[in-house]
Regions:
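Catalytic Tyr-X3-Lys loop
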Residues: 84, 106-125, 140, 144, ...
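Conserved glycine-rich Rossmann-like NAD(P)H-binding loop of the short-chain dehydrogenase/reductase
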Residues: 28-45
């Protein structure tokens, strides 16, 4: 298996971590189906990855829809004839703004709460569900979910009453699937970023916000999207085949 061209689906592929993950996998010659809800950003991803040795196909889809998730898996198999792993990067806070963090409970509507779970948990669940038959048939597959440090503790300015429980659910989903699917040859792991240095973070929240998080790191710097992508790639690639059910914190030493 180590010598064949690997094929992956990356969801949220037009965002910061998702885009960096797609680039990292393509740089090693993999086939990647990049999935995102934004056609415009997918076009930018294609342009950005045009010179990389791997083959990129893109697909616009809302993965909170079961039909869409099933269609994405089917498209990957139709285009590439194979699927080795999925990076479930799609997620985040809904309609994020400068004052999104730690918003009062009274401002958390049920619709927003459910949309946050749909974006973070439903998408990962549905992709795993529809990839399982293919993975089981070949006796091999890898799923990497993206959780957050916000899943583990009360942390100021890292989420809200909808986002933090959703990311905790991603951890629970990861651990449950690893046990349920492991004897079928399917490995399921997750990464847990803290605040990730990206253009969007700096533009949305400003320098003072970034500096407060920077002060809490053990390394004196924040993780970058490329750091998160490297961790995801490690968990997708063959060198991590003995690992399942783990959550890897990629957060510059923040516990």
């Amino acid at each position: 298996m180590n010598n064949e061209t690997r094929t992956y689906i990356v969801t949220g592929a037009a965002g910061g971590i998702g885009g960096a993950t797609a680039r990292r996998l393509l740089a090693k010659g993999a086939n990647v189906l990049g999935v995102d809800i934004s056609a415009r950003r997918l076009e930018a991803l294609q342009a950005n990855c045009a010179e990389l040795p791997g083959k990129l196909e893109v697909c616009r889809a809302d993965l909170s829809s079961e039909e869409a998730a099933q269609g994405v898996v089917e498209k990957c198999l139709a285009v590439f004839g194979e699927l080795h792993g999925i990076a479930n990067v799609a997620g985040g806070m809904v309609d994020i703004e400068a004052d999104s963090m730690d918003r009062p409970l009274a401002q958390i509507g049920l619709d927003y709460f459910r949309r946050t779970f749909a974006l973070n948990v439903d998408t990962a669940f549905l992709m795993a569900k529809h990839a399982e038959p293919h993975f089981e048939a070949k006796g091999y597959g890898k799923i990497v979910n993206v959780a957050s440090l916000a899943a583990f503790a009360n942390r100021h300015e890292l989420g809200d009453t909808a986002y933090n429980p959703a990311k905790a659910a991603v951890v629970g989903l990861t651990q449950t699937l690893s046990l349920l699917l492991g004897r079928k040859g399917i490995r399921v792991n997750a990464i847990a970023p803290g605040l990730v240095m990206s253009d969007k973070v700096q533009e949305t929240f400003g320098k003072a916000y970034v500096d407060r998080h920077l002060a809490a790191t053990a390394l004196g710097k924040l993780a970058r999207v490329e750091d998160e992508a490297e961790a995801i790639a490690f968990l997708l690639e063959p060198q991590s085949d003995a690992i399942s059910g783990e959550v890897l914190r990629v957060a510059a030493g923040v516990r």
